[in-house]
A protein has these predicted regions:
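Electrostatic cytochrome c docking/interface patches
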Residues: 19-52
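C-terminal capping alpha-helices of c-type cytochrome domains
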Residues: 88, 92-93, 109-145
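Sec/Tat signal peptide C-region and signal peptidase I cleavage site
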Residues: 13-17
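Short pre-active-site segment immediately N-terminal to redox-active cysteine/selenocysteine motifs
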Residues: 52-56, 64, 132
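Bacterial N-terminal signal peptides
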Residues: 2-12
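Gly/Gly-Pro-rich "capping" loops immediately C-terminal to redox-active cysteine motifs
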Residues: 39, 48, 58, 62-99, ...
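Second-shell loop/turn segments in exported
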Residues: 32-35, 78-79, 122-126
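Domain-scale selection of a single, long terminal region
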Residues: 1-4, 24-26
Length: 145
């Protein structure tokens, strides 16, 4: 039920229809190449992570964003993410966390295939655009221990 609520909230975000889908290649445990062909903006990525209407990351994760209260405790702390994973590994986790844990409650923010119970209005549309994914990856990569 929680997963359904998370996905429903994410699918209602305005960013959903903002981007054309771009192909990506998974190499082992990462997507090495940027989805946009350029680096993301860490400041925009931080804003996406903190925004409870766009990324909803803090619904489940805790992160080094002290001005945001009531952060989640269902998923790993985002602090130190840039020390634990490469940009490519972070990218794949945001694009499709199910690659690492098939029972995760984290929705695939960019994958649109093989999803269950998606309303027609949201079918074949990623939750975050390629640019937003790259911005989030750029921000998470700055979070070093």
């Amino acid at each position: 039920m929680l997963l359904g609520a998370i996905v429903a909230a994410l699918l209602a975000t305005p960013a959903l229809a903002a981007d054309v889908r771009r192909a990506y290649v998974v190499n082992g445990d990462e997507i090495k190449a940027s989805l946009t062909g350029r680096a993301g903006d860490p400041a925009r990525g931080r804003a996406i992570v903190a925004n409870r209407q766009v990324g909803l990351c803090l619904l489940c994760h805790t992160g080094p964003i002290p001005e945001e209260r009531f952060q989640g405790d269902l998923a790993p702390d985002l602090g130190g993410a840039g020390s634990r994973w490469t940009e490519g590994q972070l990218r794949l986790r945001v694009v499709d966390a199910e690659r690492f844990n098939p029972t995760t409650i984290m929705p695939p923010y960019f994958r649109t295939e093989k999803l269950a119970r998606v309303a027609k209005a949201f079918a074949d549309k990623p939750i975050l655009s390629a640019e937003q994914i790259e911005d989030v990856v750029a921000y998470l990569a700055t979070l070093k221990d």
